Each structure stands twice: as structure tokens, then as C-alpha cells.
Amino acid sequence: MAVRNFRQSDLALVCAIYAASKMDELINETRQYQFLPLVDDQRRYPQLMESDIFVYDDDEVKGYGAVCGSEIRALYVSPEHRAQGVGRRLLEHMLVKSGEGASLYIAKNNHAARRLYQSYGFVITSEFETDYNGVAVAACKMSLQA
């Protein structure tokens, strides 16, 4: 079990994990969302590619995360590998990379993500509305408290 740096050859796997996971973060929303593949998302894909990306590789890529400065920009685990510590390992690796003042953004109703981040000391510092593929979604900024 190892977290390693992303390689360009991982891109198809990262996109597949995103495709299998993205809509899960919106499952508790009341609005209907249309999935947009990662490489077609003109906001999220460039943000991902300008970040430091890490993959959890245990003979297969099971998840990935991305950090840019102190901002954690992505943490996705393939559905069949959830609840096995993959997300925690990726988060711990990214926290070392992001240093003090780490922050991130989540869908407000993504309860699983909120619980994970709160267990590491993140607190909600603001709430706002953003969108996914043109449809409004309530979101939160979470910051790591010292």
C-alpha cells in the first residue's frame, strides 16, 4: 500500500475513479445533476492538472487526491475500495504536503466527506452556493484548525 506521485499514465484510471465517484458526493442533494466527465469539465480538470496529484497504488490505483499549496482540491476513492483506509492514507499524505492552514471545499450534504475531514480537525468556516455542470449546489469551505 503506497501513496505515490501521479504519472501521466494514471490519467485514464483517475478519470475512471472520478466517473465512478463524482455523483456520490451529490447523492443527498434534491436537485438533479448530469455527470460531466472530468476531462470535459473546464473548471475542475485544469484545477486538477495544475495541482500536485497523488494516487493510492496497491497493485492497482484505488484512489487519488490533489493539493495545490494549502488547498486540498480532490480526494476520490473508487467505490469498491471505500472504507479500507485508502481515503485516510491519501488525506494524511496531502496534509503533510499542504502544511498548516489546509483548506478544502465540499458539497454541504456530502456527509461522508464531512465526517472524514472533521475527524482530522477540519471545521466549516463558510457556506456558499456554487454549481456542478450548471446546476446550483450548496457547498462548504472547511479549514484545518490548529
For every predicted segment, state its role.
Residues A2-A16:
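A short beta-loop-alpha structural element at the N-terminal edge
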Residues C15-R44:
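Conserved GNAT-fold acetyl-CoA-binding loop/helix
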Residues Q42-V55, E71:
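A short helix-loop-beta-strand connector motif used in the catalytic cores of GNAT acetyltransferases and
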Residues V55, D59-Y76:
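Conserved beta-strand in the GNAT
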Residues I72-R82, I106-A107:
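A short, internal acetyl-CoA/4′-phosphopantetheine-binding micro-motif in the GNAT/acyltransferase core
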Residues E80-H81, G85-M94:
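Conserved acetyl-CoA pyrophosphate-binding loop and the N-cap/start of the following alpha-helix
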Residues R88, N109-S126, V135-A138:
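Conserved active-site alpha-helix within GNAT-family acetyltransferase domains
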Residues K97-N109:
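Conserved GNAT acetyl-CoA-binding A-motif
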